Design a protein with these regions (language model features):
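Short acidic-glycine loop/turn motifs at beta-strand connectors
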Residues: 49-51, 123-124
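Compact, glycine-rich, soluble single-domain proteins
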Residues: 59-74
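C-terminal binding/interaction regions
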Residues: 2-33, 82-149
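Short beta-strand scaffold segments in enzyme catalytic cores
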Residues: 40-49
Length: 149
């Protein structure tokens, strides 16, 4: 680990300290389980429910690309299947030059569950912090379904 990486890692430890560190470590760990025989692009996600429980997900590719499930959605679907529907923070990590950004489908799934913090990161310990509304402004939501009723 370079000196700069160590400094950034120390910053992660100092920001919301333990929780962010746990999310980062779990996302990096679950990333190794990614099934990516076609792209080789592994992504890990760790999602903190408001209950305090952490749910993880990795991307799972399919030869029929449209059936691929991203790490972020995998974490959300796991959380919902276990009864969690309120979230505080999502952290996503990949081996990219800049912190990895979620795809549009994942952004829409995030927006379904509110405007919580999203932390984009990479294996170089860089992070970008934002909220769901910044990733997907003007999102389609339940209010759109009531138009004209």
């Amino acid at each position: 680990m370079t000196k700069k990486q160590q400094e950034v890692m120390m910053m992660i430890y100092k920001t919301q300290d333990e929780v962010i560190r746990q999310l980062y470590e779990q996302a990096v760990r679950v990333r190794e389980n990614a099934y990516v025989p076609y792209s080789g692009f592994k992504v890990g996600a760790a999602l903190l429910g408001k209950s305090g429980k952490i749910f993880t997900g990795c991307n799972v590719e399919n030869v029929s690309y449209g059936l691929t499930v991203c790490a972020e959605r995998n974490a959300f679907f796991k959380a919902v299947s276990e009864g969690e529907t309120s979230f505080a923070v999502l952290l996503v990590v990949a081996d990219t030059p800049e912190p990895v950004s979620p795809c549009g489908a994942c952004r829409q799934v995030m927006a379904e569950f509110g405007d919580f913090e999203v932390i984009l990161s990479n294996l170089s310990y860089q992070i970008k912090r934002m909220f769901v509304h910044e990733l997907l402004p003007y999102s389609f939501d339940k209010d759109n379904l009531n138009v004209g009723k």
